């Protein structure tokens, strides 16, 4: 455990999780700013021009997908050479930070022989990866 200023002890796994979440979030936000700048500057071609985006935002998702031709699920990966879709990479990175945090604390939990939390962390990783995979779909 890491000792804090007021004599409180913080478990090592919490420090690891918090550090990864903080720095990963910071990197992710910087990454989003860079990819957004690439989009609005026109450095890469885009499926939706910035000036058309606000009009598309006034409609539902189905209309947006129909007008842009973007596929649902992970199909957007095939379009990362477009500036507006490149933003999705940064967003996907931000979404993956929680999984990275859990993966990082599993060895610490194992070392502490904290079986319950190890099982919960592994289950969380599996559930998040399964949800992100698109294999399970509800309401479609």
Curated annotation (Swiss-Prot):
Keywords carried by this UniProt record: Cell membrane, Membrane, Transmembrane, Transmembrane helix
Localization annotation: Cell membrane
Record membrane topology: Multi-pass membrane protein
Top-rank lineage group of the source organism: Archaea
Bilayer-crossing regions: 20-42, 88-110, 115-137
Any Gene Ontology CC annotation: plasma membrane
Protein name: Uncharacterized protein AF_1562
């Amino acid at each position: 455990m890491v000792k804090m200023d007021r004599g409180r002890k913080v478990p090592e796994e919490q420090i690891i999780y918090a550090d990864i979440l903080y720095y990963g979030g910071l990197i992710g936000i910087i990454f989003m700013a860079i990819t957004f700048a690439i989009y609005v500057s026109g450095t890469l071609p885009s499926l939706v021009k910035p000036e058309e985006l606000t009009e598309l935002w006034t409609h539902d998702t189905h209309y947006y997908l129909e007008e842009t031709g973007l596929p649902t699920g992970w199909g957007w990966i095939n379009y990362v050479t477009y500036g507006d879709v490149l933003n999705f990479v940064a967003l996907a990175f931000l979404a993956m930070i929680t999984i990275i945090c859990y993966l990082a604390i599993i060895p610490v939990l194992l070392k502490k022989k904290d079986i319950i939390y190890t099982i919960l962390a592994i289950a969380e990783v599996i559930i998040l990866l399964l949800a992100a995979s698109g294999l399970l779909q509800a309401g479609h």
